[in-house]
Structure formats: structure tokens, C-alpha cells
Amino acid sequence: MTNCIVELTDGIFKQYILESKKAVLVDFWAEWCNPCKILAPILEDIAKEYEHKLIVTKINIDKNPNTAPKYSIRGIPALLLFKNSELVGTKVGALSKVQLKDFLNLYLK
């Protein structure tokens, strides 16, 4: 993981989302998840391209088991987009870069 992506924990998740001035994209992932590994470099690219309006974060569901159930996460990778502290969009599964950009552009105009 690069410095462009913020690693969240159960302990700081809610506070981080509430205090962020930018939109926050959260990737719920696990080390054993192959689609998560495919998505990781795409998220790094997105973090750089959208740095002026978006913060990309990750939360490992094995190390932080309390946050995912609060958002009914049943499959990973799961991407949740928060804007002004509110959940505005969700995507489950590995997306291509084009699909992810299309998803983000719906909400980050």
C-alpha cells in the first residue's frame, strides 16, 4: 500500500469519515481475497488521480471485524463512498479502472 491510501481501523473509522473535508472511498478487503489484490493497484491510481476531491482508504475486515457488519458487508472487495459524512454509494466486487471512475464521477461532480 502506498502513502496515497489511508489504512483505517475499527477504532478510527467513524471519526475519520465524520471529520473528512473530502469524499472518502473505503475499500473493505482481506489479505486472502484475490479480487481485492486485483483492485489494489487500481485504487492506488485512483487515489493519485482524484487526490484533490477524494481520500481513498482501506479497512482489513479480518483485523477490524466490527465495522463491516454495520454496513451489511457480505462480500469483498466492497467499496463504500461517503460524502459529507453520508454513505452515497456502494459497489461490491473487483471493478476495472473505467468502472470505478464511472462510479466515482456519478457522485463527485
From Swiss-Prot:
Disulfide bonds: 33-36
Gene3D superfamilies: Glutaredoxin (3.40.30.10)
UniProt superkingdom: Bacteria
Short name of one Pfam family: Thioredoxin
UniProt entry keywords in alphabetical sequence: Disulfide bond, Electron transport, Redox-active center, Transport
Any one GO molecular function term: protein-disulfide reductase activity
Protein family: Belongs to the thioredoxin family.
UniProt-recorded name of the protein: Thioredoxin
